UniProtKB/Swiss-Prot annotation:
Protein name as catalogued: Photosystem II reaction center protein H
Ranges annotated as spanning the membrane: 29-49
Organism: Gloeobacter violaceus (strain ATCC 29082 / PCC 7421)
Keyword Cell inner membrane: yes
Subunit relationships: PSII is composed of 1 copy each of membrane proteins PsbA, PsbB, PsbC, PsbD, PsbE, PsbF, PsbH, PsbI, PsbJ, PsbK, PsbL, PsbM, PsbT, PsbX, Psb30/Ycf12, peripheral proteins PsbO, CyanoQ (PsbQ), PsbU, PsbV and a large number of cofactors. It forms dimeric complexes.
SUPFAM superfamilies per record: Photosystem II 10 kDa phosphoprotein PsbH
Name of the gene: psbH
Pfam entry (one): PsbH
Keyword annotations of the record: Cell inner membrane, Cell membrane, Membrane, Photosynthesis, Photosystem II, Transmembrane, Transmembrane helix
Family annotation (HAMAP family): PSII_PsbH
Compartmental location: Cell inner membrane
């Protein structure tokens, strides 16, 4: 026989709706919006890493990455 615990008693109501489906679309629009926002976040991160997104005052004086200089990376001699 399974032992009853305080945590189990607290979590039991969360599992009482098992097997029942929510009518209509449920939380699908919220999930779609969050996926879209995550996609925008990933695109912004990609553009920053690729130096194709210019930010005012952030990219000034910063050398470009090797990807931004072309296929070969040739450091300048001192």
């Amino acid at each position: 026989m399974a032992r009853r615990t305080w945590l189990g008693d607290r979590l039991k109501p969360l599992n009482s709706e098992i097997g029942k489906a929510s009518p209509g679309w449920g939380t699908t629009p919220i999930m779609g919006a969050l996926i879209a926002l995550f996609g925008v976040f990933l695109i912004i991160i990609l553009q920053i890493a690729n130096n194709s997104l210019l930010l005012e005052g952030v990219n000034e004086g910063v050398p470009q990455s090797p990807a931004g200089q072309g296929y070969g990376y040739y450091p300048q001699s001192r």
